[in-house]
């Protein structure tokens, strides 16, 4: 039962907070800093995450129309922060070994994905292989959820804003060419 606490806490926070009120793309971006299990090196973590875990997540994400799932292979330190919180849970930074990013249309979609039997029986148990589930947030040491605002997409400027401002900075930029 403890294994289910974190996914349901994330889903409940998202649903209760109404954080899907996107004004531009209509989508929500979740960025999660992940801590590796103590028995794996950072390189082993990255390799397993990309080659073993990602193929388990991909069909589930596609089924739920997740727009984008990305992994960033990077390490560092961050203040532990629970999903939906605007304040850190502690003042001491914690290590992280990667960043997972999900872009999705609604909080309900993410909640349904995290409650799906495939997630509970295949994906979540696999997380125990390479993620430090004893760490803050069950290894998701900091999670931030916010509105997705596209500025450049497909090598194109897609910023939506004041036309005069756009023209001003297009002109300034052109003066540097």
Predicted regions and their residues:
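Fungal secretory targeting signals
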Residues: 1-21
């Amino acid at each position: 039962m403890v294994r289910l606490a974190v996914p349901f806490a994330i889903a409940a926070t998202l649903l209760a907070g109404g954080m899907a009120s996107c004004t531009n793309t209509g989508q929500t971006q979740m960025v999660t800093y992940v801590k590796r299990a103590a028995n794996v090196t950072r390189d082993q973590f990255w390799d397993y995450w990309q080659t073993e875990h990602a193929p388990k997540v991909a069909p589930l994400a596609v089924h739920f129309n997740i727009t984008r799932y990305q992994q960033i292979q990077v390490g560092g330190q961050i203040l532990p922060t629970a999903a939906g919180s605007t304040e850190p849970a502690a003042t001491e930074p914690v290590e992280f070994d990667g960043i997972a990013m999900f872009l999705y249309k609604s909080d309900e979609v993410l909640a349904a994905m995290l409650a799906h039997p495939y997630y509970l029986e295949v994906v979540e148990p696999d997380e125990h292989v390479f993620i430090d589930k004893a760490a803050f947030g069950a290894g998701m040491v900091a999670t931030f959820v916010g509105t997705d605002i596209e500025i450049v997409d497909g090598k194109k400027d897609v910023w939506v804003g004041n036309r005069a401002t756009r023209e001003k900075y297009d002109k300034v930029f052109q003066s540097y060419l």
